[in-house]
């Protein structure tokens, strides 16, 4: 059986609080049965059954210990995609190790012991200043950090700063980039020049180019990669992870 790569995204990202959008269509057995046009209005996108994403909290130390016990029992070394800074409501940024010191220290020890691999999941996960929830409408489009429309200097600054924060804290080279929201650009690729990044992992290739990369490997999500968010683990616990492993005949 082919080895399965497990990857957890959105660690340390404030998108889990501020990426608020609603569910308009409801399905039964794959068929649309109900449409609610006000799902993105005010409080509706924060309540069941209209809430589609935020809000949920960061994983706690005790939750991480349970999750890692499952991975270790199955001899799996997961990829943990960390966003280097938490963007606050006022657009200020708090580095991951300062915002979540217990979680960060636990992950650092696991990384240094080769129990996990830390990947770069951006500096902010969002367009800073446009990340806050709207009274009406979805802000999901702005919870993508490496938009092709952004100036190349922004791509470069975010790559360099995120690498600086993560490598300084984890004390090892960070060699994988997981673009937030599976969106990245040729500008992002050029911004990686001179860093330790050797691989890009996500579901889609560059949004604005199909040029091959000379020095970086692209690993698409799909067969052989189980990518998910910390949201699933926060909401459904380690049992969700165990069930996923059973789907891959990992007992």
Language-model-derived ranges and their functions:
Residues 1-176, 183-226, 233-251:
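Catalytic alpha-helical scaffold of carbohydrate-active enzymes acting on polysaccharides/glycoconjugates
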């Amino acid at each position: 059986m082919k080895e399965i790569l497990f990857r957890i995204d959105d660690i340390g990202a404030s998108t889990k609080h501020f990426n608020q959008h609603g569910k308009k269509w409801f399905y039964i057995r794959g068929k649309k049965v109900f449409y609610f046009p006000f799902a993105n209005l005010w409080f509706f996108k924060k309540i069941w059954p209209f809430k589609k994403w935020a809000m949920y909290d960061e994983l706690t130390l005790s939750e991480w210990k349970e999750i890692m016990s499952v991975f270790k029992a199955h001899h799996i070394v997961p990829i943990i995609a960390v966003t280097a800074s938490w963007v606050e409501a006022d657009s200020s940024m708090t580095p991951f190790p300062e915002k979540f010191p217990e979680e960060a220290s636990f992950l650092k020890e696991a990384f240094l012991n080769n129990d996990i691999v830390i990947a770069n999941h951006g500096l902010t996960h969002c367009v800073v200043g446009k990340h806050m929830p709207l009274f009406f409408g979805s802000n999901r489009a702005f919870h993508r950090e490496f938009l092709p429309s952004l100036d190349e200097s922004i791509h470069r600054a975010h790559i360099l700063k995120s690498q600086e924060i993560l490598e300084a804290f984890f004390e090892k080279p960070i060699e994988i980039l997981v673009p937030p929201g599976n969106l990245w650009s040729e500008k992002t690729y050029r911004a990686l020049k001179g860093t330790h990044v050797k691989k890009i992992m996500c579901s889609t290739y560059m949004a604005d180019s199909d040029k091959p990369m000379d020095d970086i490997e692209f690993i698409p999500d799909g067969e052989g990669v189980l990518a998910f968010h910390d949201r699933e683990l926060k909401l459904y616990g380690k049992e969700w992870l165990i069930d996923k492993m059973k789907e891959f005949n990992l007992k």
